[in-house]
């Protein structure tokens, strides 16, 4: 069955027929390619570094309020500004430009242009969905039956996001006599969803983060340890506890929900003749939803 706004829609077309047992099995594999972000025309590392250099040179400040330029520029954000602050060169750069920077600062800034992190490639993936269905049906003149089992495993384009569903259907009809026919149907399914704790505009949401993360930021060092992004949070780079790494966050958060539903339907049919029939149906449904959210202290 499928849940509707005011109840449950039950598909009753699949029923057993008189005759020898009929066995069916089918499987389906669905491929969902990785997201295509080429049309977004995002900046690469060289373009982003050049933009930061331009904005940093053109921004104006005052002592009390900081920025006076109407352009929304935050000189403390961005790796270019961090490098200049490290060498105490922001004022010199504003007066003398690129040639006023020390060779060490120039080399550090130029190195940023060589790092091009493909966030679409490391945050998303190609995904596959597997579906299996098995059924057996048959019966005699008095009793017919239809039983089926189904299983679906769907992986999301984001690693760690998945859905699995198991469903069972059992239908039996009894022809008591020429007038009376009774039946019983049972529909059961269990659905499990795995994802992460986030919201639409949360940094842990890869769709959102991949659009604001700098292309020159590498989330791991050469040993595979986490590196932290200080440009997407309101914090200072001197405060290591406030740095952000989406992979560390996702490794320490989890959200799992399990939904179980069982629906039983009993029906009675009285047949007086070909023109006159009376049909009655009653159903009972049981639902259970459990949800678990986890967020580590890190």
Q: Where are the predicted features?
A:
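A beta-strand signature from Gram-negative outer-membrane beta-barrel systems
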Residues: 1-24, 124, 129-131, 144, ...
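Outer-membrane beta-barrel initiation region
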Residues: 122-126, 136-140
């Amino acid at each position: 069955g499928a849940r509707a706004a005011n109840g449950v829609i039950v598909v009753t077309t699949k029923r057993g027929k008189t005759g020898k047992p009929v066995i069916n099995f089918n499987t389906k594999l669905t491929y969902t390619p990785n997201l295509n972000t080429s049309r977004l025309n995002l900046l690469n590392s060289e373009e982003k570094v050049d933009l930061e250099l331009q904005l940093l040179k053109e921004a104006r400040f005052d002592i009390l309020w900081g920025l006076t330029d109407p352009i929304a520029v935050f000189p403390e954000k961005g790796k270019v500004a961090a490098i200049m602050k490290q060498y105490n060169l922001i004022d010199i750069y504003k007066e003398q430009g690129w040639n006023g920077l020390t060779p060490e600062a120039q080399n550090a800034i130029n190195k940023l242009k060589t790092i091009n992190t493909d966030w679409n490639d490391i945050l998303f993936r190609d995904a596959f969905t597997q579906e299996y269905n098995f059924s057996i049906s048959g019966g005699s003149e008095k009793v017919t039956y239809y039983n089926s089992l189904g299983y679906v495993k769907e992986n999301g384009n984001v690693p760690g996001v998945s859905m699995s569903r198991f469903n069972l259907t059992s239908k039996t009809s009894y022809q008591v006599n020429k007038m009376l026919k009774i039946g019983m149907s049972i529909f059961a399914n269990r659905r499990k969803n795995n994802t992460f704790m986030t919201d639409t505009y949360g940094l842990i949401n890869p769709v959102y983060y991949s659009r604001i993360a700098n292309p020159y930021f590498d989330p791991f060092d050469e040993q595979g340890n986490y590196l932290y992004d200080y440009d997407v949070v309101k914090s200072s780079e001197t405060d290591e506890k406030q740095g952000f790494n989406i992979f560390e966050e996702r490794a320490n958060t989890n959200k799992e929900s399990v939904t179980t539903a069982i629906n039983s339907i009993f029906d009675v049919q009285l047949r007086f003749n070909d023109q006159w029939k009376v049909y009655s149906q009653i159903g009972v449904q049981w639902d259970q939803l459990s949800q678990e959210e986890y967020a580590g202290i890190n």
